[in-house]
Every structure is written in C-alpha cells, then in structure tokens.
C-alpha cells in the first residue's frame, strides 16, 4: 500500500477533508441555531450555545455572510438569517410545488398512455428525475428517483433544452459535449440542433433509444407563471410497445399534459 505523507509535524493538523466536514457541520449548526432563535442572535450567544470558540464562531459567520446565508445588523451587531437561505428553501418549495400540481395530470397521462410518467428538473448540465408514476403494465422500464440524465440524450433532457435561447443552449452543449450512449445518440451538433428545433415547433421531443437501448421516451417542457422552464414531463416505455407509429399521438398527449400543468402553475400564454 502506498504511504500518504502529509506536511507538517505528525498529529499537528487534521486531514483537510475532516476539517472541511467539521466546518460544514458547524456552519449548519449555526444556521439551525439562528432558525430556532427566531432568525437572529448575537455572536456571543451563538458561541455559548453551540460550545464554539468566539473566534471560530465569528469566522464561520463571515464565511456564511459571503454566501449571503447570514447578514449582520450594523446597529446592534446581531446576526440574522440571510437571503441565500431563503433562495435555497424557495427552490425546494418550488420543486415540490411543481410535483404537487403535476400529480393529478401525471396520473391522467399514465392512464391514457399506458406508460410510466416521469418529471425531471434541470440541475446544472444534467436532468434529474424528481417524480415518477409507474404504469400498470407487467413490462416496464423505470429509472429510480434522483437518477441523472444527459440533457442531449434523453427525452426529459431535450425537453429542458429546446425552449432555451440559442446562446444558452450552445453554452451548455459546449460544456457537456455530446457523449454517445447508444448507436442512436445524437452526437453531432447540426443533427441535435435540428432535432431541438423540430421539438420546439411540435411542443414535444422524442428520445429514440438515445440513452438506453430498448427504451423510448417522449417529453415536453413545463413552464411557470412567468414563462420560464421549470421541469419536463415525459412518458417512457419499451421500444417494442412505445413504437414510432405512436409517437405523434402520444407526443401530442404529453404536450397537452405539459400545457395543462403550466396553466395550473399560472402560465397565461403558452410558447
């Protein structure tokens, strides 16, 4: 086994990873204490109640302040929960809101299509599966919740891409590249852009075994009340059942479902 050498005197410093984890735990503890204290507290009270050195507490507060998770009252010097915490919570609530609104429409789509229904959101340069309603068929192909999907090579991923402005779309593709997963993955830029343009016109996109061999998927974008893409809804099934002759009828069904969810989220005019 290769020996790992660390600089400094033996036993003087903890491993970097351990120190980082400890700092994170202490930062979370500070935020939790502020929440229980009604949103604000003095540095001395935080230090006392969390059994932390005053200097350490102040240093952690400054780190949290840089991330906008806390801010300091210039008059009293007390520390308050900041806007960054609200933004994180709002993102969670927003995703949960999409799912709660989408629930009845997902069930209707599952019953009408006979296929498994999925809801995914974009997380950076990936799509993440956050909701699923399995079909009743004995033969079904389902990815577990939390699965990460490539944006360019999955139905949900392409549905999250096609509404984007060209500049943002190109930026994402250049960052992620066009990895090939199956023989039918779209791996050249002109073909992918043409596919996304067609999806934009139709209001839905089709994944023809582009991510998993034997699995087809049809997806459409979901918009919020201001017209921003917040999620994608899709149906997925074995290519032996979700065949090409069903793509148009099922695509329109998925598109109409996405529009109904968008309307329920407050969208007035559909793209």
From Swiss-Prot:
Residues 21-83 form the HTH iclR-type domain. Keywords: DNA-binding, Repressor, Transcription, Transcription regulation. Residues 43-62 bind DNA. Glyoxylate binds at residues 154-156, 207, 217, 234-236. One of its GO terms (molecular function) is DNA binding. Changing residue 217 to A/S: Slightly reduced repressor activity. Loss of glyoxylate-triggered dissociation from DNA. PROSITE patterns: HTH_ICLR, ICLR_ED. It comes from the Bacteria. One of its GO terms (cellular component) is cytosol. Residues 98-267 form the IclR-ED domain. GO terms for biological process: DNA damage response; negative regulation of DNA-templated transcription. PANTHER family: HELIX-TURN-HELIX TRANSCRIPTIONAL REGULATOR, ICLR FAMILY, HTH-TYPE TRANSCRIPTIONAL REPRESSOR ALLR. Homotetramer and homodimer. Homotetramer in its active, DNA-bound form. Homodimer in its inactive form. Negative regulator of allantoin and glyoxylate utilization operons. Binds to the gcl promoter and to the allS-allA intergenic region. Binding to DNA is abolished by glyoxylate. This is HTH-type transcriptional repressor AllR.
């Amino acid at each position: 086994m290769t020996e790992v050498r660390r600089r400094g005197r033996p036993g003087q410093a903890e491993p970097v990873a351990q120190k980082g984890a400890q700092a994170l735990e202490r930062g979370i503890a500070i935020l939790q204490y502020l929440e229980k204290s009604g949103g604000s507290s003095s540095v001395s009270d935080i230090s006392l109640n969390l059994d932390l050195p005053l200097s350490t507490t102040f240093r952690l507060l400054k780190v949290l302040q840089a991330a906008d998770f806390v801010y300091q009252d210039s008059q009293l010097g007390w520390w308050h929960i900041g806007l960054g915490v609200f933004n994180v919570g709002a993102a969670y609530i927003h995703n949960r809101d999409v799912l709660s609104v989408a629930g009845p429409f997902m069930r209707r789509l599952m019953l009408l299509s006979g296929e498994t229904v999925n809801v995914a959101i974009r997380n950076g340069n990936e799509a993440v599966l956050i909701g699923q309603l399995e079909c009743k068929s004995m033969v079904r192909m389902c990815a577990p919740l939390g699965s990460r999907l490539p944006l360019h090579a999955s139905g949900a991923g392409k549905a999250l891409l096609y509404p984007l402005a060209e500049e943002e779309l190109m930026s994402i593709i250049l960052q992620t590249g066009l990895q090939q997963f199956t023989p039918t993955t779209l791996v050249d830029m002109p073909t992918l852009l043409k596919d996304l343009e067609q999806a934009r016109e139709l209001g839905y996109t089709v994944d023809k075994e582009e991510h998993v061999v034997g699995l087809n998927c049809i997806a459409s974008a979901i918009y919020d009340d201001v017209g921003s893409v917040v999620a994608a809804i899709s149906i997925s099934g074995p290519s032996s059942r979700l065949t090409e002759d069903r793509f148009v009828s099922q695509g329109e069904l998925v598109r109409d479902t996405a529009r109904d969810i968008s309307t329920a989220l407050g969208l007035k005019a559909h793209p």
